[in-house]
Each structure stands twice: as structure tokens, then as C-alpha cells.
């Protein structure tokens, strides 16, 4: 049985570093020192993500995009009560506050994008892991087979959902209300953790409007894998007409050992 609550220290908890930077301001009479917290873009453990991302595309999809998103987030939380909060907590603190709508979007996008890149590995390394006797990934393989039939069927369903998606969005594999793996789509910077911020209206994914008041859990769903369908992720290497090839290549570059760890960390 899967447990959709998050444990302390789980890999799905805050993902961007919260550092402290000290600065000073000087006038003719006084010297004023002040410190404030700010989020930074962490280094990726995997930089060789060929053939999914060329170095130039990786610079756009990770370095430039993440720097922009984190800068916008820092600009909005500086000097506020949110300044000392993690990115993960900012998502929850701002989700229901219209005056912090932009802050939510930037925090959620920073989280989503890092979550995406944490699950990737170059195809050569992925193939080596696949052929290794030490790379069993028994839990995720069993869960995928039970809920989707096979990884091939899962990929087919992802293609189907992507072909029916318009605009910037994220596709997620999540542990759902019934402790099953399921697909979820969130538009723009929507978060799978919050029922009110799925930002998804696909009737194939959500059959009815959830009764939020009846939900006992803190988190709506626990994501274990996501796919970025923002144009900046695939335009450089694939153009606008080859998104299906981008999805196939992404599937070949998933580090299933990471997904295995995310899943097993949610097991009772």
C-alpha cells in the first residue's frame, strides 16, 4: 500500500538552497549593515543529458530559465514574511492568496523545474544502468505494470495526454487519492501538491470536482516523475514540430533509480 503523506527528509521536500547573503549600505553619516535570505540555483548532479538536451539547450532549459525564475522569486519575497521560507513552503503559503499569485507561480515553477531535472540522466548512462544487475527498480516496475500495464503503455498514455495539451504545462506521474499511480497535468506552474492549484481541466484526468473539505491529507498527490512541456525545454533541439520525439527521448533519459527512491520513500 502506498502512503501519500510525505516523510521528513523525503526527496520531494524543498529542493532549492536557502542561503544568507550579507550586504551593506553606506551614507555620509551612518553605515547600515543588513542581511537577508535568498534562494540560489543549485548545481545539477547530471550535466551530460545527451541526447535529450544539447549543452546549448540545457543552458536555456536549466541555467537561464531557473536563474530567471529564482531571481523573480527572490525579488518578490525580499523584505517580506516569506523571505525565510523554503521554496516548498512558499508554494503552500501563497497558493490561496491572490496578492501573492506571481510569487506562487515563480516558487512552483522553480520547484517543478528542479524536480524535472533531478530525474534525468544521459541515455548512455541510462542504458548502462538498465543493463546492470544492480539496477532492479523492482518497486517502480511493479507499480507501473500494475497501473499502466507496462512502461510502453505508460509512454503511450503520456503521448496521448501531451497531444491534447495546449500551451505551457507539466505532465506528472503521481500517487493519487486511491494509492495508485496516475497521470496528472498542471498548466503553467500548477502544483500537484494542492487540489486548488492543479490548474488542469482535462476530463480524462479529473472526473469530478474534488471535495476539498473531505480531504484528510496535507498533500493532494505525491509526484514521483514529471515532464516539462514548456516550449523552452524542447524548442532549441527539437523545434515546435517534433515534440513527440522530445518525449520519446525524455523517456529514454529517465533515471529510474531516482523514481524508485521517490516511490519507495512513500511506501508504508
Swiss-Prot record:
PANTHER family: 37S RIBOSOMAL PROTEIN S26, MITOCHONDRIAL, SMALL RIBOSOMAL SUBUNIT PROTEIN MS43. GO terms for molecular function: metal ion binding; structural constituent of ribosome; superoxide dismutase activity. It is found in: Mitochondrion. Signal peptide: none annotated. Component of the mitochondrial ribosome (mitoribosome), a dedicated translation machinery responsible for the synthesis of mitochondrial genome-encoded proteins, including at least some of the essential transmembrane subunits of the mitochondrial respiratory chain. The mitoribosomes are attached to the mitochondrial inner membrane and translation products are cotranslationally integrated into the membrane. Keywords: Mitochondrion, Ribonucleoprotein, Ribosomal protein, Transit peptide. One of its GO terms (biological process) is mitochondrial translation. It holds the Pfam family Sod_Fe_C. Component of the mitochondrial small ribosomal subunit (mt-SSU). Mature yeast 74S mitochondrial ribosomes consist of a small (37S) and a large (54S) subunit. The 37S small subunit contains a 15S ribosomal RNA (15S mt-rRNA) and at least 32 different proteins. The 54S large subunit contains a 21S rRNA (21S mt-rRNA) and at least 45 different proteins. mS43 forms a dimer with mS42, building a large protuberance adjacent to the mRNA channel exit in the mt-SSU body. Residues 1-23 form a transit peptide. GO terms for cellular component: cytoplasm; mitochondrial small ribosomal subunit. The keyword Ribonucleoprotein applies. It comes from Schizosaccharomyces pombe (strain 972 / ATCC 24843). Belongs to the mitochondrion-specific ribosomal protein mS43 family. This is Small ribosomal subunit protein mS43.
Amino acid at each position: 500500500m502506498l502512503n501519500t503523506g510525505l516523510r521528513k527528509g523525503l526527496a520531494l521536500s524543498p529542493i532549492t538552497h536557502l542561503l544568507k547573503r550579507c550586504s551593506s549600505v553606506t551614507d555620509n553619516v551612518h553605515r547600515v549593515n543588513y542581511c537577508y535570505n535568498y534562494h540560489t540555483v543549485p548545481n545539477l548532479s547530471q550535466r551530460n543529458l545527451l541526447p535529450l538536451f544539447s549543452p546549448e539547450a540545457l543552458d536555456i532549459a536549466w541555467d537561464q530559465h531557473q536563474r530567471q525564475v529564482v531571481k523573480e522569486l527572490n525579488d518578490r519575497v525580499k523584505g517580506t514574511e516569506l523571505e525565510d521560507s523554503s521554496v516548498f513552503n512558499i508554494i503552500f503559503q501563497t497558493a490561496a492568496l491572490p496578492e501573492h499569485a506571481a510569487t506562487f507561480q515563480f516558487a512552483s515553477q522553480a520547484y517543478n523545474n528542479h524536480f524535472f531535472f533531478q530525474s534525468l540522466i544521459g541515455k548512455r548512462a541510462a542504458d548502462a544502468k538498465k543493463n546492470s544487475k544492480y539496477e532492479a527498480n523492482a518497486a517502480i516496475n511493479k507499480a507501473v505494470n500494475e497501473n499502466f500495464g507496462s512502461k510502453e503503455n505508460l509512454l503511450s498514455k503520456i503521448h496521448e495526454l501531451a497531444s491534447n495539451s495546449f500551451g505551457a504545462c507539466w505532465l506528472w506521474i503521481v500517487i493519487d487519492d486511491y494509492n495508485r499511480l496516475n497521470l496528472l497535468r498542471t498548466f503553467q506552474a500548477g502544483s500537484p501538491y494542492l487540489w486548488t492549484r492543479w490548474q488542469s481541466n482535462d476530463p480524462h484526468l479529473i472526473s469530478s470536482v474534488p471535495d476539498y473539505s473531505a480531504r484528510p491529507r496535507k498533500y493532494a498527490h505525491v509526484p514521483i516523475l514529471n515532464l516539462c512541456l514548456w516550449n523552452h525545454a524542447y524548442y532549441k533541439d527539437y523545434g515546435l514540430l517534433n515534440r513527440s520525439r522530445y518525449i520519446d527521448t525524455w523517456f529514454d533519459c529517465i533515471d529510474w533509480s531516482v523514481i524508485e527512491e521517490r516511490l519507495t520513500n512513500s511506501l508504508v
